[in-house]
Every structure is written in structure tokens, then in C-alpha cells.
């Protein structure tokens, strides 16, 4: 079968229709975000940057779980990424959790 968003992107104007990709859920669904960026270049300007625990698959701090953020961010240009939103659903310690996620991303992006 075909993914619904492949159909949508194949049949809409690339300058008018863009997508927002949740990196954690795409990864969990065994969808490679970088492959999606290459298949639909410039169509993913918005990202949900979140992670899932390697064992429980529950939401985790960014950089501690299953998502390969280095490879994904290395391909940001191909995606057309303009903005990303850092999330952790049900964060047990929201301020500490988002601070840890921020610190991870800051180190990754400014290495």
C-alpha cells in the first residue's frame, strides 16, 4: 500500500502544501525520516522533535531514546525544515526534562 501523505504530496503543489513530521512516531513506525526528506524534498518544514525510550517505547528526553537525531539534523536542508518543536508527552519533570532535551540539542547542533 501507499502512505496517505505520499498520495497527498504527489498530488498537490509543492509550494502550497507542506507536512509536519513527528520524528519519534515516524521512527517507531519504522519510517526513516531522512528517506522521507529525500523522497519529498522541501516538504517537511515543521518537525516534532521528540524521542521514545528504547525499552518501553514511552516518551523520553530528546537524545536518550530510539531517534537518530544527528543523522536527521544533518539532513535538515533536504527536508526544508524551518522550525522544530521539542516535546516530551507526559514529562514527569517538565522543566528538567525540557532543559535536558535543550542541552542535548544545543550540543548536537553546535558541535
Set out the residue ranges of the language-model regions:
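Histidine-acidic metal/acid-base catalytic patches
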Residues: 2-18, 25-111
Amino acid at each position: 500500500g501507499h502512505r496517505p501523505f505520499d498520495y497527498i504530496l504527489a498530488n498537490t503543489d509543492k509550494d502550497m502544501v507542506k507536512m509536519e513530521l513527528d520524528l519519534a512516531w515516524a521512527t517507531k513506525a519504522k519510517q526513516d525520516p531522512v528517506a522521507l526528506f529525500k523522497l519529498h524534498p522541501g516538504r517537511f518544514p515543521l518537525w516534532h522533535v521528540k524521542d521514545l525510550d528504547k525499552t518501553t517505547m514511552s516518551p523520553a528526553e530528546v537524545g536518550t531514546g530510539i531517534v537518530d537525531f544527528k543523522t536527521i539534523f544533518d539532513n535538515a536542508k533536504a527536508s526544508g525544515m524551518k522550525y522544530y518543536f521539542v516535546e516530551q508527552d507526559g514529562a514527569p519533570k517538565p522543566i528538567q526534562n525540557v532543559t535536558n532535551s535543550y542541552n542535548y540539542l544545543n550540543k548536537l547542533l553546535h558541535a
